[in-house]
Amino acid sequence: MSNTANDWRTPTLVIIAGCLIAVIGFGARSTFGLYLDPLTGARGWTRETFSLALAIQNLMWGLGLPIAGAIADRFGASKVILAGALLYAVGVYGMSVAETSSMFYLTAGVITGTGVAFTAFSLAMAAMARVVGPERRSMVLGLGTAAGSLGQVIFSPLSQGFISSFGWQQALLLQAAIVLILIPLAMLLPSAKASAKDPNDEQTLGGALSEALSHRGFVLLTMGFFVCGFHVAFITVHFPSYIKDVGLPAHVGAWSLAIIGLFNIAGSFLSGIAGQRFSKKSSLSVIYLARAVVITAMLLLPKTAIFIYLFAAIMGLLWLSTVPLTTGIVAQVFGVRYLATLFGVVFLSHQIGSFLGVWLGGRLYDASGSYDGMWWAGVFFGVVAAIVHWPINEKPLARLQDATV
Protein backbone atom coordinates (compact mmCIF):
# COMPACT_ATOMS: atom_id res chain seq x y z
CA MET A 1 0.00 0.00 0.00
CA SER A 2 1.34 3.38 -0.86
CA ASN A 3 -0.57 5.22 1.80
CA THR A 4 1.91 5.74 4.65
CA ALA A 5 -0.91 5.75 7.17
CA ASN A 6 -1.44 2.12 6.23
CA ASP A 7 2.23 1.04 6.10
CA TRP A 8 2.10 -0.58 9.54
CA ARG A 9 -0.92 -2.63 8.47
CA THR A 10 1.03 -5.54 7.02
CA PRO A 11 -0.74 -8.25 4.99
CA THR A 12 -0.35 -10.65 7.91
CA LEU A 13 -1.94 -8.19 10.34
CA VAL A 14 -4.81 -7.47 7.95
CA ILE A 15 -5.47 -11.19 7.47
CA ILE A 16 -5.41 -11.88 11.24
CA ALA A 17 -7.73 -8.94 11.96
CA GLY A 18 -10.06 -9.98 9.15
CA CYS A 19 -10.24 -13.52 10.49
CA LEU A 20 -11.02 -12.32 14.03
CA ILE A 21 -13.74 -10.03 12.67
CA ALA A 22 -15.24 -13.05 10.91
CA VAL A 23 -15.06 -15.12 14.12
CA ILE A 24 -16.99 -12.59 16.19
CA GLY A 25 -19.30 -11.06 13.61
CA PHE A 26 -20.47 -14.32 12.09
CA GLY A 27 -20.23 -16.35 15.28
CA ALA A 28 -22.53 -14.10 17.30
CA ARG A 29 -25.34 -13.98 14.74
CA SER A 30 -25.17 -17.73 14.02
CA THR A 31 -26.51 -18.52 17.50
CA PHE A 32 -29.79 -16.59 17.42
CA GLY A 33 -31.73 -19.79 16.74
CA LEU A 34 -30.84 -20.95 20.26
CA TYR A 35 -33.05 -18.15 21.62
CA LEU A 36 -36.18 -19.22 19.73
CA ASP A 37 -37.71 -21.42 22.43
CA PRO A 38 -36.75 -19.47 25.59
CA LEU A 39 -37.57 -16.07 24.11
CA THR A 40 -40.90 -17.00 22.53
CA GLY A 41 -41.85 -18.87 25.69
CA ALA A 42 -41.12 -15.85 27.87
CA ARG A 43 -42.90 -13.38 25.57
CA GLY A 44 -45.78 -15.63 24.58
CA TRP A 45 -44.98 -15.28 20.87
CA THR A 46 -45.33 -17.84 18.08
CA ARG A 47 -42.38 -19.26 16.19
CA GLU A 48 -43.52 -17.26 13.18
CA THR A 49 -43.07 -14.00 15.13
CA PHE A 50 -39.49 -14.90 16.00
CA SER A 51 -38.85 -16.25 12.52
CA LEU A 52 -40.14 -13.10 10.83
CA ALA A 53 -37.82 -10.94 12.95
CA LEU A 54 -34.79 -13.00 11.95
CA ALA A 55 -36.03 -13.12 8.36
CA ILE A 56 -36.10 -9.31 8.38
CA GLN A 57 -32.59 -9.41 9.86
CA ASN A 58 -31.37 -11.57 6.98
CA LEU A 59 -33.08 -9.32 4.45
CA MET A 60 -31.55 -6.18 5.98
CA TRP A 61 -28.18 -7.93 5.92
CA GLY A 62 -28.66 -8.57 2.21
CA LEU A 63 -29.96 -5.09 1.40
CA GLY A 64 -27.27 -3.39 3.47
CA LEU A 65 -24.25 -5.32 2.23
CA PRO A 66 -24.06 -3.81 -1.29
CA ILE A 67 -24.19 -0.36 0.33
CA ALA A 68 -21.58 -1.33 2.92
CA GLY A 69 -19.47 -2.87 0.18
CA ALA A 70 -19.62 0.26 -1.98
CA ILE A 71 -18.55 2.42 0.98
CA ALA A 72 -15.77 -0.03 1.86
CA ASP A 73 -14.54 -0.13 -1.74
CA ARG A 74 -14.33 3.67 -1.70
CA PHE A 75 -13.07 4.41 1.81
CA GLY A 76 -11.89 1.08 3.23
CA ALA A 77 -13.61 -1.46 5.46
CA SER A 78 -12.35 -0.06 8.78
CA LYS A 79 -14.89 2.73 9.30
CA VAL A 80 -17.72 0.66 7.86
CA ILE A 81 -17.17 -2.20 10.32
CA LEU A 82 -16.69 0.22 13.23
CA ALA A 83 -20.09 1.82 12.60
CA GLY A 84 -21.64 -1.58 12.02
CA ALA A 85 -20.35 -2.91 15.34
CA LEU A 86 -22.16 -0.14 17.21
CA LEU A 87 -25.43 -0.88 15.41
CA TYR A 88 -24.97 -4.61 15.91
CA ALA A 89 -24.47 -4.24 19.67
CA VAL A 90 -27.43 -1.87 20.02
CA GLY A 91 -29.63 -4.29 18.11
CA VAL A 92 -28.68 -7.31 20.22
CA TYR A 93 -29.23 -5.29 23.39
CA GLY A 94 -32.63 -4.28 22.02
CA MET A 95 -33.52 -7.94 21.47
CA SER A 96 -33.11 -8.54 25.19
CA VAL A 97 -35.52 -5.78 26.26
CA ALA A 98 -38.10 -5.76 23.44
CA GLU A 99 -41.51 -6.62 24.90
CA THR A 100 -43.66 -6.23 21.79
CA SER A 101 -43.38 -7.99 18.46
CA SER A 102 -43.05 -4.69 16.60
CA MET A 103 -40.12 -3.64 18.78
CA PHE A 104 -38.55 -7.06 18.30
CA TYR A 105 -38.89 -6.68 14.53
CA LEU A 106 -37.10 -3.32 14.81
CA THR A 107 -34.27 -4.46 17.10
CA ALA A 108 -33.67 -8.06 16.04
CA GLY A 109 -34.63 -7.39 12.44
CA VAL A 110 -33.81 -3.90 11.19
CA ILE A 111 -31.08 -2.70 13.58
CA THR A 112 -29.25 -5.98 14.11
CA GLY A 113 -29.58 -6.86 10.43
CA THR A 114 -28.04 -3.56 9.37
CA GLY A 115 -25.27 -4.03 11.93
CA VAL A 116 -24.56 -7.51 10.61
CA ALA A 117 -24.39 -6.13 7.06
CA PHE A 118 -21.87 -3.46 8.03
CA THR A 119 -19.71 -5.98 9.94
CA ALA A 120 -20.06 -8.80 7.39
CA PHE A 121 -17.01 -11.00 7.07
CA SER A 122 -17.15 -10.49 3.29
CA LEU A 123 -16.03 -6.89 3.88
CA ALA A 124 -13.00 -8.10 5.80
CA MET A 125 -12.40 -10.79 3.17
CA ALA A 126 -12.36 -8.17 0.41
CA ALA A 127 -9.70 -6.28 2.37
CA MET A 128 -7.77 -9.54 2.81
CA ALA A 129 -8.03 -10.34 -0.91
CA ARG A 130 -6.43 -7.01 -1.81
CA VAL A 131 -3.27 -7.59 0.24
CA VAL A 132 -2.29 -10.87 -1.46
CA GLY A 133 -1.53 -11.84 -5.03
CA PRO A 134 -3.99 -13.64 -7.33
CA GLU A 135 -2.21 -16.96 -6.78
CA ARG A 136 -3.04 -16.90 -3.04
CA ARG A 137 -6.41 -15.19 -3.20
CA SER A 138 -8.65 -18.27 -3.24
CA MET A 139 -6.80 -19.76 -0.27
CA VAL A 140 -7.08 -16.52 1.74
CA LEU A 141 -10.81 -16.31 0.98
CA GLY A 142 -11.14 -19.87 2.23
CA LEU A 143 -9.24 -18.95 5.38
CA GLY A 144 -11.56 -16.01 6.06
CA THR A 145 -14.64 -18.15 5.56
CA ALA A 146 -13.20 -20.84 7.82
CA ALA A 147 -12.69 -18.19 10.50
CA GLY A 148 -16.39 -17.37 10.36
CA SER A 149 -17.12 -21.04 10.91
CA LEU A 150 -14.77 -21.09 13.88
CA GLY A 151 -16.95 -18.35 15.33
CA GLN A 152 -19.95 -20.65 15.04
CA VAL A 153 -18.00 -23.40 16.80
CA ILE A 154 -17.10 -21.07 19.65
CA PHE A 155 -20.34 -19.14 20.01
CA SER A 156 -22.85 -22.01 19.77
CA PRO A 157 -21.86 -23.78 23.02
CA LEU A 158 -20.86 -20.45 24.58
CA SER A 159 -24.29 -18.93 23.97
CA GLN A 160 -26.07 -22.08 25.14
CA GLY A 161 -23.95 -21.94 28.28
CA PHE A 162 -24.86 -18.28 28.80
CA ILE A 163 -28.57 -19.11 28.38
CA SER A 164 -28.38 -22.06 30.78
CA SER A 165 -26.37 -20.17 33.40
CA PHE A 166 -27.79 -16.64 33.25
CA GLY A 167 -31.04 -16.81 31.27
CA TRP A 168 -31.69 -15.66 27.72
CA GLN A 169 -31.81 -11.91 28.50
CA GLN A 170 -28.43 -11.80 30.22
CA ALA A 171 -27.02 -14.03 27.49
CA LEU A 172 -28.01 -11.47 24.85
CA LEU A 173 -26.44 -8.68 26.89
CA LEU A 174 -23.19 -10.63 27.07
CA GLN A 175 -23.26 -11.17 23.31
CA ALA A 176 -23.83 -7.46 22.74
CA ALA A 177 -20.73 -6.71 24.81
CA ILE A 178 -18.66 -9.23 22.87
CA VAL A 179 -19.73 -7.68 19.56
CA LEU A 180 -18.11 -4.39 20.64
CA ILE A 181 -14.71 -6.10 20.36
CA LEU A 182 -15.14 -5.62 16.61
CA ILE A 183 -14.37 -1.91 17.04
CA PRO A 184 -10.63 -2.22 17.86
CA LEU A 185 -10.29 -5.04 15.33
CA ALA A 186 -11.77 -2.83 12.60
CA MET A 187 -9.08 -0.25 13.26
CA LEU A 188 -6.46 -2.78 12.15
CA LEU A 189 -7.88 -2.89 8.62
CA PRO A 190 -6.78 -0.37 5.96
CA SER A 191 -8.65 2.89 6.52
CA ALA A 192 -8.59 3.86 2.85
CA LYS A 193 -8.73 2.09 -0.49
CA ALA A 194 -5.59 0.11 -1.26
CA SER A 195 -3.67 1.64 -4.13
CA ALA A 196 -2.25 -1.56 -5.54
CA LYS A 197 -2.24 -1.72 -9.34
CA ASP A 198 -5.36 -3.34 -10.75
CA PRO A 199 -6.71 -3.45 -14.30
CA ASN A 200 -9.99 -2.13 -12.86
CA ASP A 201 -8.50 1.07 -11.44
CA GLU A 202 -10.11 3.36 -14.02
CA GLN A 203 -13.51 1.70 -13.86
CA THR A 204 -16.37 3.46 -12.10
CA LEU A 205 -18.74 1.79 -9.66
CA GLY A 206 -21.62 2.22 -12.10
CA GLY A 207 -19.54 0.73 -14.88
CA ALA A 208 -18.63 -2.26 -12.73
CA LEU A 209 -22.26 -2.91 -11.81
CA SER A 210 -23.43 -2.56 -15.42
CA GLU A 211 -20.71 -4.90 -16.62
CA ALA A 212 -21.52 -7.54 -13.99
CA LEU A 213 -25.28 -7.43 -14.43
CA SER A 214 -24.91 -7.93 -18.19
CA HIS A 215 -22.68 -10.98 -17.67
CA ARG A 216 -24.65 -14.25 -17.88
CA GLY A 217 -22.34 -16.02 -15.46
CA PHE A 218 -22.79 -13.32 -12.81
CA VAL A 219 -26.58 -13.61 -13.11
CA LEU A 220 -26.45 -17.42 -12.79
CA LEU A 221 -24.07 -17.17 -9.83
CA THR A 222 -26.45 -14.74 -8.14
CA MET A 223 -29.41 -17.05 -8.76
CA GLY A 224 -27.56 -20.04 -7.34
CA PHE A 225 -26.46 -18.24 -4.18
CA PHE A 226 -30.15 -17.81 -3.29
CA VAL A 227 -30.19 -21.53 -2.50
CA CYS A 228 -27.20 -21.29 -0.18
CA GLY A 229 -29.03 -18.65 1.85
CA PHE A 230 -32.22 -20.72 1.96
CA HIS A 231 -30.36 -23.76 3.31
CA VAL A 232 -28.05 -22.04 5.78
CA ALA A 233 -30.56 -19.64 7.33
CA PHE A 234 -33.30 -22.25 7.73
CA ILE A 235 -30.95 -24.71 9.43
CA THR A 236 -29.26 -22.06 11.60
CA VAL A 237 -32.55 -20.76 13.02
CA HIS A 238 -34.81 -23.81 13.03
CA PHE A 239 -32.52 -26.82 13.46
CA PRO A 240 -32.25 -26.54 17.27
CA SER A 241 -36.05 -26.53 17.55
CA TYR A 242 -36.33 -29.35 15.01
CA ILE A 243 -33.99 -31.41 17.18
CA LYS A 244 -36.22 -30.89 20.21
CA ASP A 245 -39.32 -31.71 18.16
CA VAL A 246 -37.93 -35.15 17.27
CA GLY A 247 -37.42 -35.87 20.97
CA LEU A 248 -33.74 -35.09 21.49
CA PRO A 249 -32.41 -32.80 24.26
CA ALA A 250 -31.65 -29.12 23.65
CA HIS A 251 -27.90 -29.56 23.95
CA VAL A 252 -27.94 -31.77 20.85
CA GLY A 253 -29.17 -28.79 18.83
CA ALA A 254 -26.51 -26.48 20.25
CA TRP A 255 -23.73 -28.98 19.67
CA SER A 256 -25.03 -29.70 16.17
CA LEU A 257 -24.57 -26.04 15.24
CA ALA A 258 -21.09 -26.17 16.75
CA ILE A 259 -20.27 -29.33 14.78
CA ILE A 260 -21.50 -27.69 11.57
CA GLY A 261 -19.16 -24.79 12.27
CA LEU A 262 -16.27 -27.08 13.23
CA PHE A 263 -16.43 -29.13 10.06
CA ASN A 264 -17.02 -26.04 7.98
CA ILE A 265 -13.62 -24.78 9.06
CA ALA A 266 -12.15 -27.68 7.10
CA GLY A 267 -14.76 -27.46 4.34
CA SER A 268 -14.25 -23.74 3.73
CA PHE A 269 -10.47 -23.92 3.77
CA LEU A 270 -10.40 -26.99 1.52
CA SER A 271 -12.84 -25.38 -0.92
CA GLY A 272 -10.53 -22.37 -1.09
CA ILE A 273 -7.63 -24.66 -1.98
CA ALA A 274 -9.83 -26.57 -4.44
CA GLY A 275 -10.71 -23.27 -6.09
CA GLN A 276 -7.03 -22.81 -6.95
CA ARG A 277 -6.78 -26.24 -8.59
CA PHE A 278 -10.19 -27.06 -10.04
CA SER A 279 -13.10 -25.32 -11.71
CA LYS A 280 -14.90 -23.19 -9.14
CA LYS A 281 -18.30 -23.40 -10.83
CA SER A 282 -18.10 -27.20 -11.14
CA SER A 283 -17.13 -27.45 -7.48
CA LEU A 284 -20.20 -25.38 -6.58
CA SER A 285 -22.45 -27.74 -8.56
CA VAL A 286 -21.04 -30.71 -6.65
CA ILE A 287 -21.55 -28.97 -3.29
CA TYR A 288 -25.20 -28.08 -3.93
CA LEU A 289 -26.01 -31.57 -5.22
CA ALA A 290 -24.31 -33.10 -2.17
CA ARG A 291 -26.46 -30.92 0.11
CA ALA A 292 -29.60 -32.30 -1.54
CA VAL A 293 -28.40 -35.88 -1.00
CA VAL A 294 -27.48 -35.29 2.65
CA ILE A 295 -30.80 -33.62 3.50
CA THR A 296 -32.68 -36.49 1.85
CA ALA A 297 -30.76 -39.01 3.95
CA MET A 298 -31.50 -37.02 7.11
CA LEU A 299 -35.23 -37.10 6.36
CA LEU A 300 -35.38 -40.82 5.61
CA LEU A 301 -33.13 -42.26 8.34
CA PRO A 302 -33.80 -42.57 12.12
CA LYS A 303 -33.18 -39.41 14.17
CA THR A 304 -30.72 -40.48 16.85
CA ALA A 305 -28.24 -38.11 18.48
CA ILE A 306 -25.33 -39.86 16.76
CA PHE A 307 -27.00 -39.59 13.35
CA ILE A 308 -27.83 -35.91 13.90
CA TYR A 309 -24.19 -35.24 14.77
CA LEU A 310 -23.13 -37.13 11.62
CA PHE A 311 -25.56 -35.06 9.53
CA ALA A 312 -24.17 -31.89 11.11
CA ALA A 313 -20.60 -32.95 10.32
CA ILE A 314 -21.30 -33.65 6.65
CA MET A 315 -23.46 -30.55 6.25
CA GLY A 316 -20.66 -28.59 7.91
CA LEU A 317 -18.24 -29.63 5.18
CA LEU A 318 -20.72 -28.24 2.65
CA TRP A 319 -21.89 -25.25 4.72
CA LEU A 320 -19.98 -22.13 3.71
CA SER A 321 -17.66 -23.91 1.32
CA THR A 322 -19.71 -22.07 -1.31
CA VAL A 323 -18.43 -18.67 -0.17
CA PRO A 324 -14.73 -18.76 -1.19
CA LEU A 325 -15.73 -20.33 -4.51
CA THR A 326 -18.50 -17.79 -5.18
CA THR A 327 -16.31 -14.87 -4.09
CA GLY A 328 -13.45 -16.36 -6.07
CA ILE A 329 -15.49 -16.44 -9.28
CA VAL A 330 -16.44 -12.79 -8.85
CA ALA A 331 -12.79 -11.81 -8.27
CA GLN A 332 -11.57 -14.05 -11.08
CA VAL A 333 -14.01 -12.75 -13.68
CA PHE A 334 -14.25 -9.06 -12.70
CA GLY A 335 -11.14 -8.31 -10.59
CA VAL A 336 -10.88 -7.08 -7.00
CA ARG A 337 -11.41 -3.32 -7.39
CA TYR A 338 -15.15 -3.54 -6.66
CA LEU A 339 -15.14 -7.00 -5.11
CA ALA A 340 -16.98 -5.96 -1.93
CA THR A 341 -19.72 -4.26 -3.95
CA LEU A 342 -20.18 -7.02 -6.53
CA PHE A 343 -20.17 -9.76 -3.91
CA GLY A 344 -22.69 -7.66 -1.99
CA VAL A 345 -25.03 -7.84 -4.98
CA VAL A 346 -24.62 -11.62 -5.19
CA PHE A 347 -25.11 -11.83 -1.44
CA LEU A 348 -28.40 -9.94 -1.66
CA SER A 349 -29.80 -12.95 -3.50
CA HIS A 350 -28.38 -15.16 -0.75
CA GLN A 351 -30.23 -13.12 1.85
CA ILE A 352 -33.52 -13.19 -0.04
CA GLY A 353 -33.15 -16.95 0.17
CA SER A 354 -32.33 -16.56 3.86
CA PHE A 355 -35.45 -14.46 4.42
CA LEU A 356 -37.66 -17.11 2.85
CA GLY A 357 -35.86 -19.97 4.60
CA VAL A 358 -36.28 -18.43 8.05
CA TRP A 359 -39.77 -16.97 7.66
CA LEU A 360 -41.36 -19.84 5.75
CA GLY A 361 -39.82 -22.28 8.22
CA GLY A 362 -41.72 -20.64 11.07
CA ARG A 363 -44.89 -20.06 9.08
CA LEU A 364 -45.16 -23.61 7.77
CA TYR A 365 -44.37 -25.03 11.18
CA ASP A 366 -47.13 -23.01 12.82
CA ALA A 367 -49.53 -24.11 10.07
CA SER A 368 -48.61 -27.81 9.92
CA GLY A 369 -46.66 -28.59 13.09
CA SER A 370 -43.79 -29.95 10.98
CA TYR A 371 -40.64 -28.80 9.21
CA ASP A 372 -40.71 -31.62 6.62
CA GLY A 373 -42.01 -29.41 3.80
CA MET A 374 -39.09 -27.03 4.25
CA TRP A 375 -36.57 -29.86 4.22
CA TRP A 376 -37.94 -31.23 0.93
CA ALA A 377 -37.91 -27.72 -0.52
CA GLY A 378 -34.23 -27.61 0.41
CA VAL A 379 -33.63 -30.84 -1.52
CA PHE A 380 -35.36 -29.44 -4.61
CA PHE A 381 -33.46 -26.15 -4.49
CA GLY A 382 -30.16 -27.98 -4.05
CA VAL A 383 -30.68 -29.87 -7.30
CA VAL A 384 -31.71 -26.66 -9.10
CA ALA A 385 -28.59 -24.85 -7.85
CA ALA A 386 -26.34 -27.67 -9.06
CA ILE A 387 -27.83 -27.29 -12.54
CA VAL A 388 -27.66 -23.47 -12.53
CA HIS A 389 -23.94 -23.29 -11.74
CA TRP A 390 -22.80 -25.75 -14.38
CA PRO A 391 -22.93 -23.42 -17.46
CA ILE A 392 -21.23 -20.43 -15.76
CA ASN A 393 -18.32 -18.98 -17.75
CA GLU A 394 -15.64 -18.32 -15.13
CA LYS A 395 -12.94 -17.05 -17.48
CA PRO A 396 -11.57 -13.56 -16.65
CA LEU A 397 -12.87 -10.72 -18.80
CA ALA A 398 -10.67 -9.64 -21.68
CA ARG A 399 -9.23 -6.70 -19.73
CA LEU A 400 -8.15 -9.12 -16.97
CA GLN A 401 -6.57 -11.84 -19.08
CA ASP A 402 -3.17 -11.23 -17.49
CA ALA A 403 -4.60 -11.79 -13.97
CA THR A 404 -5.15 -15.23 -12.49
CA VAL A 405 -6.99 -16.13 -9.29
Where are the language model's segments positioned?
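Central cavity-lining transmembrane alpha-helices of secondary-active solute carriers
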Residues: A55-A70, A258-L270
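Flexible cytoplasmic inter-helical loops of multi-pass small-molecule transporters
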Residues: L188-G207, A398-V405
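Extracytoplasmic gate region of multi-pass secondary transporters
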Residues: F32-L36, R216-F269
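Helix-loop-helix hairpin linking two adjacent transmembrane segments in secondary transporters
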Residues: G144-A194
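C-terminal ends and interior cores of transmembrane alpha-helices
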Residues: L86-E99, A290-K303
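Cytoplasmic helix-loop-helix junction between adjacent transmembrane helices
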Residues: A108-A146, G335
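Hydrophobic core of transmembrane alpha-helices in multi-pass small-molecule transporters
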Residues: M103-T119, F226, F307-S321
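Helix-to-loop junctions at the C-terminal end of transmembrane segments
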Residues: G64-G76, S268-S279, D366
